[in-house]
Amino acid sequence: MGRSAPMLESEVEALRVVAKEKLPRMLAAAAERTGLHYRRVTVRKTHSRWGSCTREGNISLSLYLATLPDELIDYVCVHELCHTVHPNHSADFHAFVNHHLGGKEKTLAAKLRTYHPGRKRKEG
């Protein structure tokens, strides 16, 4: 598989419009399904991570998350929501995430590692 190319700024701006509508909606659906709560959500142009959660329950999602398959967007949303209960990456945290993902955390995490924020994925 070849290296992925960075997105053009025009592509990023078009993606921002989609992401600001889609990602908060998917986070809200994941929160409803899991019974977990967050304070607010922001969508940012971050290259180093797909999402983050503060101790206050504020969740930030990378706009590049909107380029992923819905099952991976849901995985990141559930992962960040679980940080509202476990603000770390302990064994308890991962067990909690895995519970809310029907035992698929490791599979989804492995799939997510094949993508990189802000890069176009080369098929192949």
Map each language-model feature to its residues.
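Active-site-proximal or metal-binding-adjacent scaffold patches in catalytic folds
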Residues: 1-75, 84-124
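Walker B catalytic acidic pair
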Residues: 80
